[in-house]
């Protein structure tokens, strides 16, 4: 499961996600990717499930980049405990994702395989996504 090796603080405030992604919104490594269209928290397990779905469909061809990392700690109080008495214990980590943020990138496979692989990955994620292609990608000459 994805999580930071060490954090400065064990607990963090929930915060508020507003606006679109200012960074991580351009394809940097691959020719294809999926981009988030809404604000959501994505857990490390969801990221890993999506990554496995992509690599299995691509049959270990090409390369996959995960552009988000769950570094925000989430706390939870035990069951049947009254409100108050401090913040709960850390339960796991999430990656806050805003609209426009790239989640996965792929390189080294043909267009149709990349599109289907990323569609399978998108089904594992709690956000609505959009398939994106590099602007200078040559659709006629698909030399993957």
Swiss-Prot record:
Biased composition (Basic residues): 1-16
GO-annotated cellular components: cytosolic large ribosomal subunit
Transmembrane segments: none
Family annotation (PROSITE patterns): RIBOSOMAL_L16_2 (PS00701)
Gene Ontology molecular-function annotations: rRNA binding; structural constituent of ribosome; tRNA binding
Keywords: Ribonucleoprotein, Ribosomal protein, RNA-binding, rRNA-binding, tRNA-binding
Name listed for the protein in its UniProt record: Large ribosomal subunit protein uL16
Designated gene of the protein: rplP
